[in-house]
Amino acid sequence: MARHGDTRSPSPVGSTYSSSRRSRRDDDRYERKRDDGRSYRRSRSPERRYRERDRDRDSYRRRDHSVDRRDSHRDEDNYRRRDRSRDRRRSRDRDHDRDYRRRSRSRDRDYRSRRDDSRDRVRRRTDDSADLKRKSRRDDSRDRTRGAEPKSREASTPAIPTRTGPTDDEKRAERLAKLEAWKQKQAAEKERKQKEAEASGGPRNILEEIDRKSGLSPAVSSPQSPATQGVDAAPAAYAGKFDPKAIAKNAAQTPAAPSVLGNDVAVPSSAKTSNAQTARVQASKASGNAPSPAVLKAKGNVGSFGLGTKQVADNEKSIATKTLGFGEEESTRRKLERLPTPPLDDADASKTAETNADDDDDVDMQDGETEEDAAAAARVAAERREERLQNESLTKTTNGNTTAKAEEADKMEVDAQEEELDPLDAFMSELAESAPPKKKAGAKFSKAQEPEAIFGDEHDVSMTAVGEGDAEDFLAIASKAKKKKDIPTVDHNKVEYEPFRRKFYTEPSDLAQMSEEEAANLRLELDGIKVRGLDVPKPVQKWSQCGLGIQTLDVIDKLGFASLTSIQAQAIPAIMSGRDVIGVAKTGSGKTMAFLIPMFRHIKDQRPLENMEGPIGLIMTPTRELATQIHKDCKPFLKALNLRAVCAYGGAPIKDQIAELKRGAEIIVCTPGRMIDLLAANAGRVTNLRRVTYVVLDEADRMFDMGFEPQVMKILSNVRPDRQTVLFSATFPRNMEALARKTLTKPIEIVVGGRSVVAPEITQIVEVCNEEKKFVRLLELLGNLYSTDENEDARSLIFVDRQEAADTLLRELMRKGYPCMSIHGGKDQIDRDSTIEDFKAGIFPVLIATSVAARGLDVKQLKLVVNYDAPNHLEDYVHRAGRTGRAGNTGTAVTFLTEDQERYSVDIAKALKQSGQEVPEAVQKLVDSFLEKVKAGKEKASNSGFGGKGLERLDQERDAARMRERRTYKTGEEGEDEEEKDEKKNEQAEEQFNKVLSAVQSTSAQLPGVPKGIDLDGKITVHKREVDPNAPNNPLDKVGSAVADIHARLSRAGVMRSGVPIDNRGPDAGAFHATLEINDFPQKARWAVTNRTNVAKILEATGTSITTKGSFYPAGKEPGPGENPKLYILVEGETELSVTNAMRELMRLLKEGTIAAVDSESRAPASGRYSVV
C-alpha cells in the first residue's frame, strides 16, 4: 500500500527540494496534513524515546503490513516535526535534519529505529576515528545524521559498554545453532525453489536477517531474537540502519516475527530497494575492505531465496536486460546463488562489526564461512560478475539516467570483446583488474551482449569509413574539386536511348493534290518563301492542316491567331515531319510559334517524366530577355497541355532554377552559359540531357558566332545524336550557315523575304550629322512623335553602342522632361527584367538600350526606333530596325551616321537596297569614300556577323574573380591551380616587362643619355665615374672642395622636403652610377619605383642616391631634339656593389608593379562598355 514515504515523486530521490525546502516554506500546512491525531509530539526526553522504541519496535514488525503500520509513520513524522523546533534549527545538524526528512519519505523504513540508530552511529564514529571516513560516506549516501539531537546522543552513550558483551555471546551461539539447522535443511532440500526454503520454520530468523540485509522492509530489519540481533548487525545499516549494540539490548524482549516472506513479496518497494542496494555497494567500495565482495554474495544468496533476485532483476537491471541482453548472465547467477553459505558469512560479518563499529553496513553472511569453502569458490565468478553489475547500476541509479547506463554497458562490452579477440589486450586488462575472474566473467558477459552492441557498431563503422580510405581517393577527390566545373563528355555508343517518334505530319488531301507549280506559286504568294532540301512538304494554309491536338488548337484560337504567317506555313509541316530545319524570316514574322507548336506535339507523344529525369525540349537563346519572352509565349499552352517549363538564364539565383528542374520540367528555355552551370552543378545530379530529343536554337546566327559557339557545341555534344534540331533567326550569314550545318542532319532551309532584310513595313531613315547635332535631332524626332494624340501611347526605343553612352543619354533626356529608362548588360538581371516589363506596360514611353535589347524584343505600340549610335554590321542593323513594324504594323527606324563612321555606312546602304528603299546621297558618299580606301589598302572591309571574344575572356574573368576570393578568404584550396595561374600570370608579366624594359644605361657626366645600349636580359651594368683630368691632385684641395660641396648642400636642406634625396646634379655624387628607364612601364610599375616609401627603404639599405630624371612621354611618342629624355631613374653610389643592389631592388619593384598591373587588368578588364561606379 502506498504511504507518505513513497519515493515515486517527480523529484529525484537525492534532491531536497521536494522535502526540506517545502517543509521550511509550508511548515504549518504540510504538517497539518501529515500529523493530525499523532501522539508523543511533546516528548523530547531521551528516556521516553528509548522506552517508545523498546516498546514499539517488535510490535511494529509484527504488524508490518497491517493497517497499523501507518501509525508508525505518523509517530515518526511527529518526531520529525518536533525536530523542527527553534533549538533544533540552531543546531549544527540542521542540514542533516533536512536530509533525514528527505530520506524518510521512502515507504519501507522504520523511522524510529533509524533515528535511534543514527544516535548510536554518531557515538561510534566518535569512538572509532579510524573508520571515520568510511562511516561518513555511508551517512552521505544513505542516512547521514538523520535528525539525531545532541541530547539523544549523550543519553545513549553510557548504554554501549553494558550491551557489548552479551550481544557477542548470544550472536555466536545463535549463529552456530542457525548454521546447524540450516545445513540440515539444505541437505534435505536440494531444489532451487525459493518458497520451499522460506516455508520451513527453522531458517525463519535467517530469512529475516537476509531480508534486513537486502533492505526490503523495515519490518524484516527489526531483531527477532538475540541470535537474530547478531545477524542484524551486518545488514542493519543498509535496510534500517540499526546499531547491533542497541539491538542486543532489546533482544530478549523481541518475539519471532510472523510469516515474513509473504509480506516481503507483497511489498511494492522495488525502486527503493534498488537504490538502497546501490548505496550499500558504494559504501562498501569506499571503505576499501574485504567485505565488499561479500556484499554481493549475500545479495546473491538472498536471490536464491526469491527475495533479492526479483528486485535485482526487476529494478537494478531492468533497463540493462532489455537493451543489452543480460538474460544469459542472469540465469547463470541464479544457478550459482542457491548455495547455502549465508549463515557462516553472516557470522563472520558480525565479528567484523564488533571489531569495527561502523562496518555494520558492509557485513555479509558469507565472509567467515568455515565449512562451505568449496561452494564459495565455485561462486566466485558469479559474485564478481554481480559486483560489476552493481557498480554499473550504482552510477546509473544515482544519476537516474538510462542513457548513461546504456553507454556504460556498451563500454564494458567493447572492452570485453577486445579481451576475447586479442590475448595481449586480455593480459593488459588482467593487470588493470584487481581480480582475474572478473575479466573472465566480463568476457563471458560480453558474449551475451554482442548482438545488442549498437553503439559500438556505429563507432566501428564510422572509424572504418575514415581510417580505411585510400589516400589516392582523397587526392583524386581534392583534385576533382579544384577543377573547373565542366560537363563530362558523353559516349553515346555506351548509352541506350529510348526510341522516339519524329513524324507527326500527314499531308492533307487537298495539299496532296496540289502540283509542284501550284506549290511554288503558293510560296511566292507567302512573301516569296525559298526552300532548299529534299522532300520539302508543301506549305499549309490553315491550322487544321497541321495535325495538332484539340487542346493546342483551342489555345491558338483563344490567342487570336486566325491564320499562319509565311514562316509558320512552311516551317510547321517541315518540323512536324521530323526534319531538321533552318528558318530565316524577317523580324516579327512569328518564328517563335513556328518552333513552339511542333515541340508541344513532339513532347506529348513521349512518356511522362519520371523522377530526376531531364527535359525533352531544349530551347537556347543568346540573350536573357529573349529567353524570358519565349518562356512567356509558352505559358498559354503549358496549362492546357499539362506541361512544365523552366526559364534558366544568368543573373538570376541558380538555386531557384535548380529547384524547378528537380521538380521536373519537359521544356527548358535557357542561355548557354547558365545551361552549362546547371549541367555541371552537383556533379551533374541536377539535370541531364538524356531525354532531350527536340533542340531549338533561336537567333542561331548569334549562337554560332565566336562568343557562343564553343558553349553551344559543348551542350549539343551531350544530347543524343538522333535528336531533332531546329534553327531560327532573322539574319543568317553564309559563314554562319556552314558552321550550323555541322550540327544538322539533311536539313530543310526555309528563307522568307531574304536572309538579312528589314521588313518592308518599316520606314528607314538614315541621316549623316555631327556628334553635337545628334541629340538635338533626337529631341526633334521625339517631339514630332508625341505631338499628336494618336501617338500618345506610342513607344520609342533608342539604341547606343556603349553602356556609358546609355546612362549619359538617359540623364540628358530626363533633364528635357522625357520619362525614360536604360537597359544594358551592366545592370542586374532583375533591373533588366523589370525595365522591359515597365516599358511594355507603358509606364515610361522611351527606352535607351544597347544591342542587348535588339533581338527578340516584342513590344506593341513601338513606332520609333532610333539608332543614336550606328550599328557596326548589317545583322545588328536589321535586328535593331526589326523591333518596330512587327506583325504587319508600320514603324520608323532612324539611324544617325557621323563622318568618321563611313565603315558602317556600307552595311546600312546594303540593308536599304535589299529592302527596296533609296540610299541617301550623303550615305552613298560615305560608302564610296570607304570603298576607295579599301582599294587603296588604307582600310579593311568589315566582315558580317557579331564576332566576339570567345570563352577565353570569360574564363579569364572567372579565374580572376576566383583568385580574388581566394586571396580574400584564404580558403587553403589554392593548390596546383593557383600555382599554375600564378606561373601564367608571371609569364605574362615577364613578357610585358621584357617588352618595356630598357637596358641599364651607363652615362657620362656631361651626356647622361649616352650610350643607349639596351640589355633585354635585364643585366645590371654599373659604370664608374670618369675622372676629370683637370681636377687637382692635391688631397687637401679635394678635401676643401668636398667640404664646400657639403656646405652648399646643407644650406639648401631646409628648402627640400623630408625624404626626398638631395639633387646630385647628375652622376657626379658617387664613384659609380647606373640608369633605369621607366617611361614605358605601366603606371603602377612607375609608381612602385618612385614613391617615397620604397625609395627611402632602398636608400637606407644601400646608401645610394636615387633620382628620377627626364619627362614622361605617352606610348608611341618620342622626345624631340632639345627635349628632356624619357623618364628614367639615376642610381649613384660609392661602391659598385651598392649600386648593383639598389638597381636589383628597383628592378624587383618594377616587376612587382608590372605584375600588379596585369593582375588588375585581368581582375577588372576594361570592357570599353560600362563600369559601375
From Swiss-Prot:
It comes from the Eukaryota. The keyword ATP-binding applies. Residues 24-100, 107-154, 166-198, 381-390, 405-414, 950-973 have a biased composition (Basic and acidic residues). A motif (Q motif) lies at residues 541-569. A motif (DEAD box) lies at residues 698-701. GO terms for molecular function: ATP binding; ATP hydrolysis activity; nucleic acid binding; RNA helicase activity. ATP binds at residues 585-592. Residues 572-750 form the Helicase ATP-binding domain. It holds the Pfam family KH_12. The keyword Endoplasmic reticulum does not apply. InterPro entries: DEAD/DEAH_box_helicase_dom, Helicase_ATP-bd, Helicase_C-like, P-loop_NTPase, PRP5/DDX46/KHDC4_KH, RNA-helicase_DEAD-box_CS. Residues 761-927 form the Helicase C-terminal domain. Residues 219-228, 270-290 have a biased composition (Polar residues). Keywords: ATP-binding, Helicase, Hydrolase, mRNA processing, mRNA splicing, Nucleotide-binding, Nucleus. The Q motif is unique to and characteristic of the DEAD box family of RNA helicases and controls ATP binding and hydrolysis. ATP-dependent RNA helicase involved spliceosome assembly and in nuclear splicing. Catalyzes an ATP-dependent conformational change of U2 snRNP. Bridges U1 and U2 snRNPs and enables stable U2 snRNP association with intron RNA. This is Pre-mRNA-processing ATP-dependent RNA helicase prp5. The lineage of its organism: Eukaryota, Fungi, Dikarya, Ascomycota, Pezizomycotina.
